């Protein structure tokens, strides 16, 4: 029996990119009552006075007109500043390396936007994320990795709750990126050949150091080896992340071998950046971590232990872990030592194809001793 989707209203978050354009197109073709909404989260007028959001909104309007759906623009600049950007700055201020995309999804795209969509009479919201939604016989929603393994975005969606997922659709989840491009080209969408946006949304193509220095004053300090050798000056702890190789300016200085130099630690109180030679430098290896802001995609007990796999950064293979959860905190013990576990980044849990949720890394440990990462 065919279902009548025309009575189901879906509000699509449209960015002006090809993914969200095809999302709207597919839902329209499936008979849903579709409305497109462009979110303006950041005043991104560049040094030439060109606002890229204006260009993106024009693309949204062109696509919406092509596929025959109404569209609106909503301004979330204040919400974004308060809930995402202030968090981003606070994390850098405390020597950590945040992932603003995780917080943007949690607070803006699936909270502020979801709330706004409800005022438009939405039954669901949809975005162009590469993830899959599966509903079981009890009505519980499971979030699965996107079919396109190279594009899977469940890592960035790991802070979504069951309540948020119940109202969410990911129409691209079963497609390869190449198929999405082909659909856009076949339909002659205005965004079919538009290149994907890269980097953090509010920085765009700007130089990261320059951008950050507008908001946080850089404090130069000493760059040291773990055994106390002074290697020169660092530009400010906030500019470096654990495991980073480039940008240290000490490539010519050797320490007995020809291995490259890496950031292996930070001491915020002394404003010291620690460096060491070798990709697997012992200071970069850890055996467990503490995380907070733990969020599971399904209802779970307040306290439990879980054996699963985890990712500690976006583009890395899963690693086997044991997770000890207590309310919104967790201790994650690794089956094998892990490299460059970075406070502020997301740790995300998986059971096979299913994303179970995740948290934010607070501290890494090596055999029970804290690593000097902040």
Curated annotation (Swiss-Prot):
Write down what this protein is called.
tRNA-specific 2-thiouridylase MnmA
Quick one: where's region Interaction with target base in tRNA? 99-101
In Pfam terms, one family for this protein is tRNA_Me_trans_M
Q: According to its UniProt record, where is this protein located?
A: Cytoplasm
| The keyword tRNA-binding is assigned to this record | yes
Organism this protein belongs to: Streptococcus equi subsp. zooepidemicus (strain H70)
What positions does the entry give for ATP binding? Answer: 13-20, 39, 128
Q: Per its UniProt record, what InterPro entries does this chain match?
A: MnmA-like (IPR004506), MnmA-like_C (IPR046885), MnmA-like_central (IPR046884), MnmA-like_central_sf (IPR023382), Rossmann-like_a/b/a_fold (IPR014729)
The upper taxonomy is: Bacteria, Bacillati, Bacillota, Bacilli, Lactobacillales
Protein origin, superkingdom:
Bacteria
């Amino acid at each position: 029996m065919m279902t009548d989707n025309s009575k189901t209203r879906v509000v699509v978050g449209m960015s002006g990119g090809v993914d969200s354009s095809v999302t709207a197109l597919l839902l329209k073709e499936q008979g849903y009552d579709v409305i497109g909404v462009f979110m303006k989260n950041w005043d991104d007028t560049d040094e030439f006075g060109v606002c890229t959001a204006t260009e993106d909104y024009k693309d949204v309007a062109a696509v919406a007109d092509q596929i025959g759906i109404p569209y609106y623009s909503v301004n979330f600049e204040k919400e974004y500043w308060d809930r995402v950007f202030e968090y981003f700055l606070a994390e850098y201020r405390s020597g950590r390396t945040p992932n603003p995309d995780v917080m943007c999804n949690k607070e803006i795209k699936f909270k502020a936007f979801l709330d706004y969509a409800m005022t438009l009479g939405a039954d669901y919201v949809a975005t162009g994320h590469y993830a899959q939604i599966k509903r079981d016989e009890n009505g519980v929603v499971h979030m699965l990795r996107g079919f396109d393994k190279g594009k899977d975005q469940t890592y960035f969606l790991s802070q979504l709750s069951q309540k948020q997922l119940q109202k969410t659709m990911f129409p691209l989840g079963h497609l390869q990126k190449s198929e999405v491009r082909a659909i856009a080209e076949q339909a002659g969408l205005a965004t079919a050949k538009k290149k994907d946006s890269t980097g953090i949304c509010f920085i765009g193509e700007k130089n990261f150091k320059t951008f950050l220095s507008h908001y946080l004053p850089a404090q130069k300090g000493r760059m040291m080896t773990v055994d106390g050798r002074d290697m020169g000056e660092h530009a400010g702890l906030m500019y470096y992340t654990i495991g980073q190789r480039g940008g240290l300016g000490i490539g010519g200085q050797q320490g007995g071998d020809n291995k490259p130099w890496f950031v292996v630690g930070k001491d915020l109180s002394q404003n010291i950046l620690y460096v060491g030679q070798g990709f697997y430098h012992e200071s970069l290896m850890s055996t467990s971590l503490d995380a907070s802001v733990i969020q599971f995609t399904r209802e779970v007990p307040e306290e439990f232990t879980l054996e699963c796999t985890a990712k500690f950064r976006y583009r890395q293979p899963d690693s086997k872990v044991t997770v000890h959860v207590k309310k919104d905190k967790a201790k994650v013990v690794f089956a094998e030592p892990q490299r460059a576990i970075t406070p502020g980044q997301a740790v995300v849990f998986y059971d096979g194809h299913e994303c179970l949720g995740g948290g934010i890394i607070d501290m890494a440990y090596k055999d029970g001793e804290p690593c000097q990462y902040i």
